[in-house]
């Protein structure tokens, strides 16, 4: 997210505590917060999709649902042609 937008979120939060927000500012704050949260969710999803889980013996124990996503995106050498990957 753009640092200016984050600064604006913080500015509105500070103003809300000190003097309150107008209805327009409340709408702006809600939109900015939603944009921030969506970006955060995307980053977490991207991070999780890049994880490969292995046990103590080195066996891949990544959950099947995550493996399917990785196959679709071609991550970790997983292939849609090989369901065992």
From Swiss-Prot:
Keywords: Cytoplasm. GO terms for cellular component: cytoplasm. This is UPF0291 protein SPCG_1462. Residues 62-85 are annotated as: Disordered. It is found in: Cytoplasm. The keyword Lyase does not apply. Its main location: cytoplasm. It comes from Streptococcus pneumoniae (strain CGSP14). It holds the Pfam family DUF896.
């Amino acid at each position: 997210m753009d640092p200016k937008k984050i600064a604006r979120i913080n500015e509105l939060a500070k103003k809300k505590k000190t003097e309150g927000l107008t209805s327009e500012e409340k709408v702006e704050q809600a939109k900015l917060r939603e944009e921030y949260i969506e970006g955060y969710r995307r980053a977490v999803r991207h991070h999780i999709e890049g994880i490969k889980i292995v046990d103590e013996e080195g066996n891949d124990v990544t959950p099947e649902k995550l493996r399917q996503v990785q196959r679709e995106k071609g991550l970790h050498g997983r292939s849609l042609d090989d369901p065992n990957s």
